Regions:
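Asp-based, Mg2+/Mn2+-dependent phosphohydrolase catalytic module
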Residues: 1-15, 107, 116-224
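N-terminal helical cap/lid subdomain that shapes the substrate entry/recognition surface
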Residues: 2-3, 8-105, 115-120, 128-129
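Hydrophobic residues in well-ordered beta-strands that form the structural core
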Residues: 27, 110-112, 186
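Residue-level marker of regulatory loop/turn positions in helix-turn-helix DNA-binding domains and
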Residues: 92, 111, 142
Length: 224
């Protein structure tokens, strides 16, 4: 099958799969947005200002953009504690469990802009096992759209950027993947297909992603 105006995605091969967490595997947006809205009210910052730069970025990077006069590390800790204090609304997207089960045994990593503490808490909440390789936002020098997280994940897998396909949901995430010389399948769960136009392929949901393995190769087949 093929994406309109793009290469035949059945020819999209890789040796490793890197997967974003929030917005891709799970819908954590309601809880995260509530935490940020409350934080904005306490600090006199309009929620609309936060929304313009929030998605896909590390908490500390968003704070530096919207409130450079505050101590970003201190405020990030406050936001993190708020986000993980109540995860009732956090849920997996359809197809997430099946995708991760099918990937078992293949080289893979989860890459998140969130902290390791938050990522592990959310994975436990939704019932997904902790991956062997989890790269979190607090392990890297620069967050998305910088490629640091994806480069680190590939290195831990013993792969080059060209060996990897990434599953992402945000424009800044797609930019990060491209900067890491990786190919990207974007899921239009949080943004329009047009906003994700730099990706190699765009699907509506995780359930539209399928693949088969042949030796060390993983071949993606996407339902459009």
């Amino acid at each position: 099958m093929s994406c309109a105006g793009r290469r035949d995605v059945t020819a999209l091969h890789c040796r490793a799969v890197l997967i974003d967490l929030d917005g891709t595997l799970m819908d954590s947006a309601p809880r995260i947005l509530r935490a940020w809205e409350a934080w904005g009210q306490r600090n006199g910052i309009a929620f609309e200002t936060i929304l313009k730069v929030l998605h896909g970025r590390r908490t500390i990077d968003t704070l530096r953009l919207v409130a450079p006069w505050l101590q970003a590390e201190k405020e990030a800790a406050v936001l993190e504690a708020d986000e993980i204090s109540d995860m009732q609304d956090v849920r997996l997207y359809p197809g997430a469990t099946e995708l991760m089960e099918k990937l078992r045994g293949s080289p893979q990593a989860i890459v998140t802009s969130g902290s390791r503490r938050a990522a592990e808490a959310r994975l436990k909440h939704v019932g997904l096992p902790l991956p062997t390789i989890l790269v979190s936002g607090d392990e890297i020098e620069a967050g998305k759209p910088a490629p640091d997280g994806y480069i680190l994940a590939a290195r831990r897998l013993g792969m080059d950027g060209g060996d990897c396909v990434v599953i992402e949901d945000s424009p800044v995430g797609v930019q990060a993947c491209k900067a890491a010389s990786m190919r990207v399948i974007a899921v239009a769960s949080t943004h329009t297909a047009q906003a994700l136009g730099q990706a190699d392929a765009v699907v509506r949901e995780l359930a539209d992603i399928d693949f088969r393995t042949s030796g060390e190769l993983i071949e993606f087949q996407l339902r459009q």
